[in-house]
From Swiss-Prot:
GO terms for molecular function: rRNA (pseudouridine-N3-)-methyltransferase activity. Belongs to the RNA methyltransferase RlmH family. It is an enzyme of class 2 (transferase). It catalyses: pseudouridine(1915) in 23S rRNA + S-adenosyl-L-methionine = N(3)-methylpseudouridine(1915) in 23S rRNA + S-adenosyl-L-homocysteine + H(+). This is Ribosomal RNA large subunit methyltransferase H. It is found in: Cytoplasm. Gene3D superfamilies: 3.40.1280.10. Specifically methylates the pseudouridine at position 1915 (m3Psi1915) in 23S rRNA. PANTHER family: METHYLTRANSFERASE, RIBOSOMAL RNA LARGE SUBUNIT METHYLTRANSFERASE H. The lineage of its organism: Bacteria, Bacillati, Cyanobacteriota, Cyanophyceae, Synechococcales. Pfam families: SPOUT_MTase.
Length: 145
């Protein structure tokens, strides 16, 4: 079964829009144990070092970028389930995205959509998709096809 405490989101910059903060709070309550860490934005090399240095040996790094692999919600849930008990860190870049170094270091690059979203919104969409993935795994009626 999927456990939110296995997931960590590393995101560059702060969420400044209150409606996104409110949305993230909803999903933090629905996903107890989900960790969201903000990394100070600035120089992309410093951001990269901060992301890479924070990954522990037992964690998989998943980089979110537009050229990454695309999943349906069902496929995303099944993919997470197939990872077993692995701890997963999702890295979300700032206004300049993620460096090539982070993308190359990642175990996988995924895309939330063919559309481009502001980095703040990407956090909210990812949190919702993690909740949806867990709901699918539980057989909850939250996800409808």
């Amino acid at each position: 079964m999927l456990n939110p405490s296995r997931f960590r989101i590393l995101a560059i910059g702060k969420v400044r829009k209150s409606w996104i903060q409110n949305g993230l709070e909803v999903y933090r309550k629905r996903l107890p144990g989900l960790s969201i860490t903000e990394i100070r934005d600035g120089d992309i090399k410093k951001e990269s070092r901060a992301i890479i240095s924070s990954i522990k040996k037992d964690e998989l790094l998943i980089a979110l970028c537009e050229e990454g692999e695309k999943f349906t919600s069902m496929d995303f849930s099944h993919w997470l389930q197939n990872l077993g008990s692995s701890r997963i860190v999702f890295a979300i870049g700032g206004t300049n995205g993620l460096s090539q170094e982070v993308k190359t270091s990642a175990d996988l690059c995924i895309s939330l959509s063919a559309l481009t979203f502001p980095h703040e919104m990407a956090r909210l969409i990812l949190a919702e998709q993690l909740y949806r993935a867990i709901s699918i795994a539980k057989g909850s009626p939250y996800h409808r096809e």
